[in-house]
UniProtKB/Swiss-Prot annotation:
Membership in a protein family: Belongs to the universal ribosomal protein uS7 family.
Family matches, as InterPro entries: Ribosomal_uS7, Ribosomal_uS7_bac/org-type, Ribosomal_uS7_CS, Ribosomal_uS7_dom, Ribosomal_uS7_dom_sf
Keywords: Ribonucleoprotein, Ribosomal protein, RNA-binding, rRNA-binding, tRNA-binding
GO terms assigned for molecular function: rRNA binding; structural constituent of ribosome; tRNA binding
Source organism of this protein record: Streptococcus sanguinis (strain SK36)
Designated gene of the protein: rpsG
Keyword check for rRNA-binding: yes
Protein name as annotated: Small ribosomal subunit protein uS7
Function comment: One of the primary rRNA binding proteins, it binds directly to 16S rRNA where it nucleates assembly of the head domain of the 30S subunit. Is located at the subunit interface close to the decoding center, probably blocks exit of the E-site tRNA.
Length: 156
């Protein structure tokens, strides 16, 4: 393990349009090669599509989607007596949002729609309706944790 100090967490500034730190983190997650402007136009374009499709506030739909994606439990490998056990642990709040955003963007990139704006909008809409691949990923994670509940006493 490294002996150096842990790097301090940088404060994320809320985005100018929705005044939300979560939206800023989504933009940062979508961003490739430092092209923040492109990433912002993708996210805001997706939010416009969501507003058109639902008639509701896009930020509320996005927050609902994130609640449906973020995992509560996950499994972590723990070595005990020469064998590895998948030990279920609770997910810290910061990691919950990080995992949720990561899964959302990764799965949106794998979708079949023509543009990233369409893919992201459709995946957020699916997640807000408790369907879609990102929600399935969370369910699979929870299922793994539930299946390995017998090893919960190995928690550290």
């Amino acid at each position: 393990m490294s002996r150096k100090n842990q790097a301090p967490k940088r404060e994320v500034l809320p985005d100018p349009l929705y005044n939300s730190k979560l939206v800023t983190r989504l933009i940062n997650r979508v961003m490739l090669d430092g092209k923040r402007g492109t990433a912002a136009s993708i996210v805001y374009g997706a939010f416009d599509q969501i507003k058109e499709a639902t008639g509701n506030d896009a930020l509320e739909v996005f927050e609902t989607a994130m609640e449906n994606i973020m995992p509560v439990l996950e499994v972590r490998a723990r070595r005990v007596g020469g064998s590895n056990y998948q030990v279920p642990v609770e997910v810290r709040p910061e990691r919950r949002t990080t995992l949720g955003l990561r899964w959302l963007v990764t799965i949106a990139r794998q979708r079949g729609e023509h543009t990233m704006v369409d893919r992201l909008a459709k995946e957020i809409l699916d997640a807000s309706n408790n369907t879609g691949a990102a929600v399935k990923k969370r369910e699979d994670t929870h299922r793994m944790a539930e299946a390995n509940r017998a090893f919960a006493h190995f928690r550290w």
